[in-house]
Amino acid sequence: MKVRIKFRKQGNMKFIGHLDIMRYFQKVMRRADVDIRYSEGFSPHQIMSFAAPLGVGLTSNGEYMDIEVLSTDDSKTMVRRMNETMVEGMEVVSYRQLDDSSKNAMSIVAAADYTLTFRPGKEPEDLDGFFQKLEAFYHQDQILITKPTKKGERQVDLKPLIYQMYRTEDAVFMQVSTGSSNNIKPELVMEAFYHSLGEEYPPFAMQIQREEVYADLGDENERKLMPLEALGEDIE
């Protein structure tokens, strides 16, 4: 049986990198007595994959991992059992069964939501003016940046890859393309914005939090974003 787990990563856990998070969940599976499937061969390992690794320093309300299990209790029980083993800052939100034919989360990630909030004392003096400039920046026809490549440099237009960007209270909400083909980090967008103002991007001025990760069930003519969690069903 394929299972998709959604979890939060908060507090000091934001400083723990992806590989250590993976090792952490391997221990969680054992401590919570999850009947996880192991690979075959000389060096068996738990069948486990993550949707989109989160950068160090970012918090999240919407991280995903897929596992395979041989047997399971209901979703509520499994969430409770795993959370009983969790350290502060980590919390399992949901545990949902997938169809046997479902692709793993990593292969279908298409977009992600982020909230960017100024740290105390790091806010611009003119906060309203900052957001007005950000809105004007987003509504440009093109947002060109220069990216280094193996053959030199090339220009990339970020605009088609930023699906939404707007002010929410005193924070920036951003929905961007995510995945193996067109992966845009919110830091890159903000760096381009500050560069357009002739200023240096202050990388530690904002706390960035991922809110959700999506698959795209649409076609080449229209996006139809669906939270990865919605592709599974609770086990009763």
Describe the residue ranges of each PLM region.
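Short amphipathic alpha-helices in soluble, non-transmembrane regions
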Residues: 78-86, 127-138, 189-190
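Extended, well-folded interaction surfaces typified by the phenylalanyl-tRNA synthetase beta subunit core
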Residues: 6-8, 12, 16, 20, ...
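Ordered, soluble secondary-structure elements with a strong preference for glycine-centered loop motifs
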Residues: 15-19, 72-77, 124-128, 180-184
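Core RNA-modification/binding signature centered on pseudouridine synthases
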Residues: 139-236
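Ordered, amphipathic secondary-structure segments that act as subunit-interaction surfaces
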Residues: 61-115
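Short beta-strand-to-loop capping motifs
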Residues: 7-9, 67-73, 116-122, 174-178
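Short, charge-patterned binding micro-sites
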Residues: 38-69
